[in-house]
Each structure stands twice: as structure tokens, then as C-alpha cells.
């Protein structure tokens, strides 16, 4: 009976220590991810200074978890989503945020959002006129931002 309790407390103790280690690692990883939010917020403010549009700036949301996307802009919620896992390099994050900012800049009405969707159906993503422009602006602005910062 004493050996049962000994093993029980050893196993419970090991699980407790492992859970503490796990929480500590999560805390350290979260601190490392903060650079992404700070950089994205700085780039967003920089874009707003260069290309002001409306009073209400877009919300910025950094998303954890797997995705095939680097980022996206949602007109209805006025939100730019950045997928952390696909923006681990400074250049990629700046380029993605600049790209999505230009979607925000160009899609400023329901009719323009509808036009984007119609063109997406007609041209596809790679040949979409707005995607071509946003890709070019994202790359150009990323070089300019990183050169100065």
C-alpha cells in the first residue's frame, strides 16, 4: 500500500512539474511573438501616415495556428488579419501588412468589395488586378520601410 502512494505522488509530481515547464515555455514563446504585433502595428501606422484614407483605422488581429494565408483584409469588420506562422521574418510581415493595407485602401465601399469578388471569380487570384497591385505595393513598401527602420 505504501508503494502505491509513493508511485502515485511521484507520477502526480512529475505531471505537475511538466505542466509548470509547459506554461513557462508558452510564456516565453508568447513574449517572442510580441515583436510581430509591435512591428505590424508600427507598419500599419506608417501606412496610415503615407496613405491616409478614413477616420476609422482598420483593426489589427494576429492569428495563431495553421493557415495557408499570410494575411487577409475583411471589409465587413474592417480588420486586417495576419497569420503569425506565415510571417516569421520581418520582411514577410512588413510585406504582408502593406499588402493587406492596400486592400483596406482600395476596398472602401460595398460596391468595391463586390467588384473584388467578381474579379476574383473571373481572373483568379494570381491574375486579379487588385492582387497584382497589392503585391507590387507590398513589396515596394516593405523595401522602403525596412531601409528606413
Regions found by a protein language model. Give the residues of each.
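A metal-dependent hydrolase signature that marks the N-terminal structural subdomain at the beginning
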Residues: 2-70, 74-79, 88
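Extended low-polarity, hydrophobic cluster-rich segments
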Residues: 40-43, 94, 98, 136
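Surface-exposed helix-capping loop/turn segments at secondary-structure junctions
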Residues: 49-56, 110-113, 145-149
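Short pre-active-site segment immediately N-terminal to the catalytic Zn-binding motif
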Residues: 80-97
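Active-site recognition of the HExxH zinc-binding catalytic motif
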Residues: 95-108
Amino acid at each position: 500500500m505504501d508503494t502505491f502512494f509513493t508511485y502515485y505522488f511521484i507520477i502526480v509530481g512529475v505531471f505537475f512539474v511538466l505542466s509548470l515547464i509547459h506554461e513557462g515555455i508558452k510564456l516565453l514563446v508568447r513574449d517572442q511573438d510580441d515583436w510581430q504585433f509591435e512591428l505590424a502595428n508600427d507598419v500599419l501606422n506608417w501606412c496610415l501616415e503615407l496613405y491616409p484614407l478614413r477616420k476609422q483605422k482598420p483593426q489589427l488581429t494576429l492569428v495563431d495556428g495553421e493557415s495557408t494565408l499570410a494575411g487577409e483584409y475583411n471589409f465587413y469588420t474592417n480588420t486586417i488579419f495576419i497569420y503569425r506562422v506565415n510571417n516569421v521574418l520581418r520582411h514577410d510581415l512588413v510585406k504582408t501588412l502593406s499588402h493587406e493595407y492596400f486592400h483596406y485602401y482600395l476596398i472602401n465601399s460595398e460596391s468595391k468589395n463586390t467588384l473584388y469578388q467578381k474579379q476574383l471569380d473571373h481572373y483568379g487570384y494570381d491574375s486579379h488586378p487588385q492582387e497584382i497591385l497589392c503585391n507590387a505595393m507590398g513589396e515596394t513598401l516593405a523595401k522602403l520601410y525596412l531601409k528606413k527602420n
